[in-house]
Amino acid sequence: NPLFGIAGEDGPTGPSGIVGQ
């Protein structure tokens, strides 16, 4: 999800960002 960044680990709403929550 762009909310967390651009590219990272999967988050609760799909691909998160740099944080990768």
UniProtKB/Swiss-Prot annotation:
For this UniProt record, the keywords arranged alphabetically read as follows: Glycoprotein, Repeat
Where is the secretion signal located? none
Region of interest (Disordered), ranges = 1-21
- Name the glycosylated positions: 1
* Domain of life the protein comes from: Eukaryota
Posttranslational modification = An unusual glucose trisaccharide is attached to the N-terminal Asn that lacks the typical N-X-[ST] motif. The carbohydrate moiety is necessary for nephritogenic activity.
sequence repeats span 5-7, 8-10, 11-13, 14-16, 17-19
Q: Does the keyword Secreted apply?
A: no
Span list, region 5 X 3 AA tandem repeats of G-X-X: 5-19
What this protein is reported to do is described as:
Can induce glomerulonephritis.
**Name this polypeptide is given:** Nephritogenoside
